[in-house]
Amino acid sequence: MARIAGVNLAIQKHVWIGLQSIYGIGRTRSRKVCDAANVAIYTKIRDLSEPEIERLRVEVGKYVIEGDLRREVGMAIKRLMDLNCYRGLRHRRGLPLRGQRTRTNARTRKGPRKAIKK
């Protein structure tokens, strides 16, 4: 099992799919990492040699990922909440931020229905 950026990658998957299990790496970035590391994207992770894994580690290390990225996102949200701007208030109340309707729908963001007491 290959370990990159503190994440164990599933050995039966292709490299570009396996890299997507790292927080902060999606489809596009995964392919860019493979190209930069000179690794074929359809190679299975179990078939990678140690030098190839090391090249992938170096390329992945150039990006903000995993814990650092989670911290950055959390701090950006906290900053909005501290500013008392509209987006910060919506975050604080657990409502949608980007103008979606809330009279109906928005159940994912608002959570389960609360019964109205009569």
UniProtKB/Swiss-Prot annotation:
Keywords: Ribonucleoprotein, Ribosomal protein, RNA-binding, rRNA-binding, tRNA-binding
A Gene Ontology biological process term: translation
PROSITE patterns in UniProt: RIBOSOMAL_S13_1, RIBOSOMAL_S13_2
Name assigned to this protein: Small ribosomal subunit protein uS13
Lineage, uppermost ranks: Bacteria, Pseudomonadati, Pseudomonadota, Gammaproteobacteria, Lysobacterales
Gene transcribed to yield this protein: rpsM
Domain of life: Bacteria
GO molecular function, one term: rRNA binding
Species per Swiss-Prot/TrEMBL record: Xylella fastidiosa (strain 9a5c)
Subunit annotation: Part of the 30S ribosomal subunit. Forms a loose heterodimer with protein S19. Forms two bridges to the 50S subunit in the 70S ribosome.
Cellular component, GO annotation: cytosol; small ribosomal subunit
